[in-house]
Amino acid sequence: MTMEEIARAISGELKNLDSNIKVTGKVVIDSRKVNKGDLFVAIKGENVDGHSFCAAAIKQGAVAVIASKEIPGVPSLIVSNGNMTSQEVDQPTVIALGKLASYLLTKLPNIWKVAVTGSSGKTTTKDLLADLGKLIGPTVAPTGSFNNEIGLPQTVLECDENTKVLILEKLF
Protein backbone atom coordinates (compact mmCIF):
# COMPACT_ATOMS: atom_id res chain seq x y z
CA MET A 1 0.00 0.00 0.00
CA THR A 2 1.15 3.53 -0.66
CA MET A 3 1.32 6.21 2.00
CA GLU A 4 -1.50 8.08 0.26
CA GLU A 5 -3.70 4.98 0.38
CA ILE A 6 -2.91 4.41 4.06
CA ALA A 7 -3.52 8.08 4.88
CA ARG A 8 -6.99 7.85 3.32
CA ALA A 9 -7.77 4.60 5.14
CA ILE A 10 -6.87 5.97 8.58
CA SER A 11 -7.82 9.63 8.05
CA GLY A 12 -4.18 10.54 8.52
CA GLU A 13 -2.08 13.49 7.40
CA LEU A 14 1.26 13.00 5.65
CA LYS A 15 4.22 14.79 7.27
CA ASN A 16 7.76 14.70 5.85
CA LEU A 17 6.60 11.89 3.59
CA ASP A 18 6.15 11.22 -0.13
CA SER A 19 2.63 9.94 -0.79
CA ASN A 20 3.90 7.38 -3.34
CA ILE A 21 6.20 5.50 -0.95
CA LYS A 22 5.03 1.92 -0.42
CA VAL A 23 5.11 -0.28 2.64
CA THR A 24 6.96 -3.38 1.46
CA GLY A 25 7.24 -5.01 4.87
CA LYS A 26 4.97 -5.46 7.85
CA VAL A 27 3.02 -3.19 10.17
CA VAL A 28 4.93 -3.26 13.47
CA ILE A 29 4.24 -1.90 16.98
CA ASP A 30 7.56 -2.90 18.58
CA SER A 31 10.43 -0.72 17.35
CA ARG A 32 12.92 -3.49 18.20
CA LYS A 33 11.28 -5.70 15.56
CA VAL A 34 11.31 -3.18 12.71
CA ASN A 35 12.83 -4.29 9.41
CA LYS A 36 13.42 -2.52 6.11
CA GLY A 37 10.14 -1.52 4.46
CA ASP A 38 7.99 -1.81 7.60
CA LEU A 39 5.44 0.70 8.89
CA PHE A 40 5.81 1.46 12.60
CA VAL A 41 2.73 2.32 14.68
CA ALA A 42 3.53 4.39 17.77
CA ILE A 43 1.18 3.31 20.55
CA LYS A 44 1.11 5.11 23.87
CA GLY A 45 0.91 2.60 26.71
CA GLU A 46 0.66 2.92 30.47
CA ASN A 47 4.42 2.83 30.98
CA VAL A 48 5.96 3.37 27.54
CA ASP A 49 5.09 5.76 24.74
CA GLY A 50 5.85 4.36 21.29
CA HIS A 51 6.35 7.91 20.02
CA SER A 52 9.71 7.87 21.84
CA PHE A 53 10.90 5.18 19.44
CA CYS A 54 9.78 6.63 16.09
CA ALA A 55 13.22 7.93 15.09
CA ALA A 56 14.79 4.58 16.02
CA ALA A 57 12.20 2.74 13.92
CA ILE A 58 13.04 4.89 10.90
CA LYS A 59 16.75 4.32 11.48
CA GLN A 60 16.12 0.56 11.49
CA GLY A 61 14.40 0.74 8.11
CA ALA A 62 10.75 1.65 8.64
CA VAL A 63 9.45 3.69 5.71
CA ALA A 64 7.19 5.75 7.98
CA VAL A 65 5.40 5.83 11.31
CA ILE A 66 1.77 6.23 12.29
CA ALA A 67 1.75 8.68 15.18
CA SER A 68 -0.66 10.92 17.04
CA LYS A 69 1.75 13.86 17.01
CA GLU A 70 4.37 15.18 14.65
CA ILE A 71 7.92 14.06 15.33
CA PRO A 72 10.46 16.46 13.76
CA GLY A 73 12.29 14.91 10.82
CA VAL A 74 10.39 11.62 10.98
CA PRO A 75 8.27 10.60 7.96
CA SER A 76 4.85 10.21 9.52
CA LEU A 77 1.16 9.63 9.02
CA ILE A 78 -0.41 11.75 11.75
CA VAL A 79 -3.75 10.75 13.21
CA SER A 80 -5.15 13.31 15.57
CA ASN A 81 -8.02 13.44 17.99
CA GLY A 82 -9.70 15.91 15.64
CA ASN A 83 -10.21 13.10 13.12
CA MET A 84 -11.88 10.84 15.67
CA THR A 85 -15.15 10.39 17.50
CA SER A 86 -15.33 10.98 21.25
CA GLN A 87 -14.91 7.24 21.96
CA GLU A 88 -11.70 7.09 19.89
CA VAL A 89 -9.71 10.06 21.19
CA ASP A 90 -7.80 8.21 23.92
CA GLN A 91 -5.77 6.00 21.56
CA PRO A 92 -5.82 7.44 18.03
CA THR A 93 -2.99 5.20 16.77
CA VAL A 94 -4.76 2.05 18.03
CA ILE A 95 -7.90 3.17 16.20
CA ALA A 96 -5.79 3.85 13.09
CA LEU A 97 -4.38 0.31 13.32
CA GLY A 98 -7.93 -1.06 13.31
CA LYS A 99 -8.97 1.17 10.41
CA LEU A 100 -5.96 0.03 8.40
CA ALA A 101 -6.82 -3.63 9.05
CA SER A 102 -10.43 -3.03 7.98
CA TYR A 103 -9.24 -1.33 4.81
CA LEU A 104 -6.90 -4.23 3.98
CA LEU A 105 -9.80 -6.68 4.26
CA THR A 106 -11.74 -4.67 1.67
CA LYS A 107 -8.78 -5.08 -0.69
CA LEU A 108 -8.70 -8.85 -0.12
CA PRO A 109 -12.36 -9.88 -0.47
CA ASN A 110 -11.71 -13.53 -1.35
CA ILE A 111 -10.12 -14.50 1.96
CA TRP A 112 -12.17 -16.92 4.02
CA LYS A 113 -12.59 -15.27 7.41
CA VAL A 114 -13.23 -17.34 10.53
CA ALA A 115 -13.76 -15.63 13.89
CA VAL A 116 -13.62 -17.51 17.18
CA THR A 117 -15.22 -15.78 20.17
CA GLY A 118 -16.18 -16.65 23.70
CA SER A 119 -14.77 -16.77 27.19
CA SER A 120 -12.82 -20.05 27.11
CA GLY A 121 -11.38 -22.48 24.57
CA LYS A 122 -10.75 -19.87 21.89
CA THR A 123 -7.03 -20.41 21.50
CA THR A 124 -7.27 -24.19 21.13
CA THR A 125 -10.15 -23.83 18.67
CA LYS A 126 -8.25 -21.15 16.74
CA ASP A 127 -5.17 -23.40 16.52
CA LEU A 128 -7.23 -26.35 15.24
CA LEU A 129 -8.96 -24.16 12.65
CA ALA A 130 -5.61 -22.77 11.52
CA ASP A 131 -4.36 -26.31 10.91
CA LEU A 132 -7.49 -27.05 8.87
CA GLY A 133 -7.13 -23.77 6.99
CA LYS A 134 -3.66 -24.80 5.84
CA LEU A 135 -5.30 -27.64 3.90
CA ILE A 136 -7.06 -24.97 1.81
CA GLY A 137 -4.04 -22.72 1.34
CA PRO A 138 -1.90 -20.05 2.99
CA THR A 139 -3.48 -19.29 6.36
CA VAL A 140 -2.97 -16.40 8.76
CA ALA A 141 -3.79 -16.89 12.45
CA PRO A 142 -2.45 -15.24 15.59
CA THR A 143 0.31 -17.00 17.47
CA GLY A 144 -0.69 -17.14 21.11
CA SER A 145 -3.69 -15.20 22.39
CA PHE A 146 -3.54 -11.82 20.66
CA ASN A 147 -7.27 -11.22 20.90
CA ASN A 148 -7.54 -7.53 21.78
CA GLU A 149 -7.88 -4.24 19.91
CA ILE A 150 -4.18 -4.31 19.03
CA GLY A 151 -3.59 -8.01 18.37
CA LEU A 152 -6.62 -8.56 16.16
CA PRO A 153 -5.71 -5.86 13.59
CA GLN A 154 -2.08 -6.98 13.69
CA THR A 155 -3.21 -10.46 12.70
CA VAL A 156 -5.31 -9.08 9.83
CA LEU A 157 -2.35 -7.00 8.63
CA GLU A 158 -0.30 -10.20 8.20
CA CYS A 159 -2.53 -11.09 5.22
CA ASP A 160 -1.52 -10.54 1.63
CA GLU A 161 -2.85 -11.41 -1.81
CA ASN A 162 -1.75 -15.05 -1.33
CA THR A 163 -3.71 -15.57 1.90
CA LYS A 164 -6.67 -17.93 1.53
CA VAL A 165 -7.83 -18.24 5.16
CA LEU A 166 -7.79 -15.76 8.05
CA ILE A 167 -8.48 -17.04 11.56
CA LEU A 168 -9.27 -14.42 14.20
CA GLU A 169 -9.77 -14.74 17.93
CA LYS A 170 -11.67 -12.16 19.96
CA LEU A 171 -12.57 -12.03 23.63
CA PHE A 172 -15.90 -10.40 24.38
Model regions: which residues?
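Phosphate-binding loop of NTP-binding sites
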Residues: V89, T93-F172
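N-terminal leader/targeting and accessory segments in enzymes
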Residues: M1-K99
